[in-house]
A protein has these predicted regions:
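GIY-YIG nuclease catalytic motif and its immediate N-terminal context
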Residues: 1-53, 80-94
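Intrinsically disordered, low-complexity regulatory tails
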Residues: 96-104
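A broadly used, surface-exposed interaction patch
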Residues: 49-71
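Nucleic-acid nuclease catalytic cores
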Residues: 68-76, 83
Length: 104
């Protein structure tokens, strides 16, 4: 099983440097005081493109936009090639972290 990458500061420069153009599941994380909280879990067939989409002014999820504006944010990802495996891992991550910006 692939491993989650370590937390990376979330901005367009680090996405360009660290996010691959491959499929996977990702977490968006914010830091408050000395604690870290997952605020969104998603998946994509192109992690770099999707992570950049969230940083764009056109991001439709207001919750994500507010976290990015008001907190120091980070991302982590795991590369997963098959859609069924991405679906499973995304659901497990959402069930585990209960991120505030995911809607059901």
């Amino acid at each position: 099983m692939p491993e989650w990458i370590d937390r990376v500061p979330y901005n367009s420069g680090t996405v360009d440097l660290y996010a691959p153009e491959t499929a996977g599941v990702y977490r968006l994380i914010y830091k408050s005081n000395d604690d870290y909280y997952v605020f969104y879990v998603g998946q994509s067939d192109n992690l770099k493109e999707r992570l950049k989409d969230h940083l764009s002014p056109g991001e439709p999820n207001e919750c994500i936009k507010n976290h990015l504006k008001n907190h120091d944010c980070f991302f982590r990802y795991i590369e997963i090639g098959t859609q069924s495996e991405r679906d499973r891992i995304e659901r497990e991550e959402i069930d585990h972290w209960k991120p505030s910006c995911n809607t059901v």
